[in-house]
């Protein structure tokens, strides 16, 4: 919990989030959704909002849920109405325990929020008092995200390779959808490509973390959490043919976790549901963000398995697991746009 003191760095960082990323206007109403771990950050956000001429309030949902219990709770209509009627909303609670789909009673609202259409932001506030925030870097990353999104719309072939053996090809002309994801703020951004069925072939060597499985919010398959770090183990190989996961190998314990996921979930999450091209470059994303599983790092792509049979409508199906691939070389129609995790001038 942050001690509520007048730390100028935290106020400067909060102002950038509210004013620049939130694009607030005087007279608007702002809501922060917080719990015990994030309430101090929410207080700072509201103080900044008032200085900018907004009306602001905090909804503390700690007594409503807390920890894993959030996932099993029904929709609370007062919270739902507050979100629907606010001009902008910042969710400061952990995004792997809460999301706007849960609060609003419609799972599709999770993806709507991630795209920024509703001005409902997933705000990773942890460490805000210590961030060495570089506003221009963040804005440049967001601009690159839009440029890459535009390039993909007219692209034909996407190839991802790594020194550790990843060699994956996607026929982009058959993609069901693609989205610029820029509402997980302040540091994160990506372009999410939803590949068409039958369009992905090759091998992914997942040497990074895996996201907590959506249907099993417990142990990640490849955890990278404080006190539970398994990235030193053999990377996991994921083998795709025509967008179907046909096999996997790696550390025996981690492979057994994936075996169990396939057994427990119906329909089994054997589809290549997403290729996430991470455009964020701020080191703060890796230090302060995604702490629940250590995934979604910079200088990565992630490849998701899942059971999305509504392709073109949603990014995240009932089951969805991202696997990070470090230091990728990304080639688009023969042009290298990212080399060993670093974007080139081509994008």
Residue ranges and their predicted role:
Residues 14, 194, 265-267, 293, ...:
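Homeobox/homeodomain signature
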Residues 231-232, 247-314:
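Dual-mode signal for accessory low-complexity, basic/Gly-rich regions
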Residues 233-235, 325-326:
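Short loop/turn microsegments at loop-to-beta-strand junctions
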Residues 203-205, 237-239, 247, 302-304:
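Structured core elements
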Residues 1-234, 241, 331-347:
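Active-site bordering "gate/hinge" segments
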């Amino acid at each position: 919990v942050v001690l509520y003191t007048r730390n100028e760095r935290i106020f400067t960082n909060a102002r950038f989030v509210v004013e620049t990323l939130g694009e607030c206007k005087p007279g608007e109403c702002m809501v922060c959704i917080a719990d015990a771990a994030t309430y101090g950050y929410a207080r700072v956000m509201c103080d900044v909002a008032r200085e900018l001429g907004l009306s602001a309030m905090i909804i503390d949902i700690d007594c409503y849920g807390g920890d894993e219990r959030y996932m099993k709770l029904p929709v609370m209509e007062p919270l739902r109405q507050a979100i629907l009627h606010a001009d902008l909303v910042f969710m400061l609670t952990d995004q792997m325990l809460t999301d706007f789909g849960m609060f609003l009673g419609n799972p599709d609202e999770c993806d709507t929020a991630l795209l920024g259409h509703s001005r409902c932001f997933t705000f990773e506030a942890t460490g805000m008092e210590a961030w060495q925030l570089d506003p221009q870097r963040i804005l440049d990353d967001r601009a690159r995200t839009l440029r890459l999104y535009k390039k993909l719309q007219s692209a034909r072939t996407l190839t991802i390779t790594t020194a550790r053996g990843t060699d994956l090809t996607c026929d982009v002309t058959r993609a069901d959808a693609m989205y610029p994801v820029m509402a997980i703020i302040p540091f994160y951004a990506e372009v999410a490509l939803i590949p068409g069925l039958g369009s992905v072939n090759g091998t992914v060597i997942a040497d990074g973390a895996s996201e907590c499985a959506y249907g099993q919010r417990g142990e990640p398959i490849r955890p990278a959490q404080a006190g539970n770090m398994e990235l030193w183990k053999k990377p996991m190989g994921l083998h795709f043919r025509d967008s179907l996961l046909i096999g996997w190998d790696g550390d025996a314990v981690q492979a057994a976790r994936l075996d169990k996921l396939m057994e427990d979930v119906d329909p089994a999450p054997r589809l290549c549901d997403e290729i996430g091209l991470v455009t964020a470059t701020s080191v703060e994303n890796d230090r302060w963000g995604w702490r629940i599983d250590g995934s979604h790092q910079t200088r990565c792509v992630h490849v998701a398995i899942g059971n999305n049979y509504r392709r073109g409508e949603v990014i995240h199906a009932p089951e969805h697991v991202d696997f990070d691939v470090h230091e990728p070389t990304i080639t688009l129609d023969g042009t290298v746009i990212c080399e060993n995790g670093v974007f080139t001038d081509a994008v």
